[in-house]
C-alpha cells in the first residue's frame, strides 16, 4: 500500500486505512430518501449515533440536507439548527465524526466545535467552502463527484467514459485543495453513486472500481446503501434493500474501497468480519493523534 493511502488525517484522529472501515449514516432531515424524519430530534439522533457505534461503526456521518434526486437545499440556518445540536453531543462518543454538508457556515461552526471531517457532495465548490476547510489545520474532507444540484443532476448524466471522467474530476479537485494548502493526506474521494448517474453508470463504477482506485492518488469512500440502482436490480423498496446493500458494500471493498458509508452498520460489520477472515492481512485500528482525553475504539 502506498504511504499516502495508509492514513486519513482528520481533526482529532489519524485514521488508519489498513482495513476497510464502516461509516454509519445519521440523517437528521425530514425528507431523506431512506430514513427521513426518524432522527429529527436531538435525543433520537443521539440514540441512533450510540446504536451505530455499539454496532461497530468506525466513523459517524451526520447530515441535515437531503440530497436525493429532485431534493431542494434547505435554508442555511435550518440546516445548521438540525445538525449542530447533534454534533455537540456526538463528539463525546470517541469515534471520528463527519458532517455531511456543503454549507460553508455549518462547516465553519462544526469544525470550530471539533468535528473531524467535512463530507461535501459538492466537493468544496461553493463560495467560501474551500477557504473554510483550509483554515482548520488537519480537518479531513471527503470530495464527492456530482454534476449540477440534486434537483437537476439526473439531467446531466451524460458521459463518454464515466470512470475516466469521475477520476479526472476528483484529481482536479484535489489539485485545487492542495493549492489552497490542504494536504492530500486530509482528503478522501467519493465517486458519487446515484449522483448525476444512471443505473448503468453506477454499475460501471462498481464493476471498474479497482481501475478507478488505481487511477486516483487517494482512497475511496463509497456509498451504495439502499440506493435506487439496488432497487432496480432486486425489485425491492427502500426498506427491503439490506441484503443488496451489504452485497454492494462487499463488492466495493473487494474492489478497493477504504470506507463504506451505510445505514445498516451491524449487518455490514458482520459481513466484513467474514471478508476479513478470508483476507486475514486486512487488519487495523483507528489511531488518534496525541491529544488530551482522546481515546479511540
Question: How should each PLM-predicted stretch be described?
Answer:
Residues 183-186:
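Short acidic capping loops at alpha-helix termini that bridge into adjacent secondary structure
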Residues 30:
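Catalytic-pocket segment enriched in acidic/His residues
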Residues 14:
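Catalytic toxin/effector domains delivered as secreted proteins or via bacterial secretion systems
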Residues 47-63, 255-256:
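Catalytic domains of carbohydrate-active enzymes, especially glycoside hydrolases
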Residues 3-7, 17, 34-43, 47-48, ...:
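Active-site-adjacent loop and "lid" segments of alpha/beta metabolic enzymes
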Amino acid at each position: 500500500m502506498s504511504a499516502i493511502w495508509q492514513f486519513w488525517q482528520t481533526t482529532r484522529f489519524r485514521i488508519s486505512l489498513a482495513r476497510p472501515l464502516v461509516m454509519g449514516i445519521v440523517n437528521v432531515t425530514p425528507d431523506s430518501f431512506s430514513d427521513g424524519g426518524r432522527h429529527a430530534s436531538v435525543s433520537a439522533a443521539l440514540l441512533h449515533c450510540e446504536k451505530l457505534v455499539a454496532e461497530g461503526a468506525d466513523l459517524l456521518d451526520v447530515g441535515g440536507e437531503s440530497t436525493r434526486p429532485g431534493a431542494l437545499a434547505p435554508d442555511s440556518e435550518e440546516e445548521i439548527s438540525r445538525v449542530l445540536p447533534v454534533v455537540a453531543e456526538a463528539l463525546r462518543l470517541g469515534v471520528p465524526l463527519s458532517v455531511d454538508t456543503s454549507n460553508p457556515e455549518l462547516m465553519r461552526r462544526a469544525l470550530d466545535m471539533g468535528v473531524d471531517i467535512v463530507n461535501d457532495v459538492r466537493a468544496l465548490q461553493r463560495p467560501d467552502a474551500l477557504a473554510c476547510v483550509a483554515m482548520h489545520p488537519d480537518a479531513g474532507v471527503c470530495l464527492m463527484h456530482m454534476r449540477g444540484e440534486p434537483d437537476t443532476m439526473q439531467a446531466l448524466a451524460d458521459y463518454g467514459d464515466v470512470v475516466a471522467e469521475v477520476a479526472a474530476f476528483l484529481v482536479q479537485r484535489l489539485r485545487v485543495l492542495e493549492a489552497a494548502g490542504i494536504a492530500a493526506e486530509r482528503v478522501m474521494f467519493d465517486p458519487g453513486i446515484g449522483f448525476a448517474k444512471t443505473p448503468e453508470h453506477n454499475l460501471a463504477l462498481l464493476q471498474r472500481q479497482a481501475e478507478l482506485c488505481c487511477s486516483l492518488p487517494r482512497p475511496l469512500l463509497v456509498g451504495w446503501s439502499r440506493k435506487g440502482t439496488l432497487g432496480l436490480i432486486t425489485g425491492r423498496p427502500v426498506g427491503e434493500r439490506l441484503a443488496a446493500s451489504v452485497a454492494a458494500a462487499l463488492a466495493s471493498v473487494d474492489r478497493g474501497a477504504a470506507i463504506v458509508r451505510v445505514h445498516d452498520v451491524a449487518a455490514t460489520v458482520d459481513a466484513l468480519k467474514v471478508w476479513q477472515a478470508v483476507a486475514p492481512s486486512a487488519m487495523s485500528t483507528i489511531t488518534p493523534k496525541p491529544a488530551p482525553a482522546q481515546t479511540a475504539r
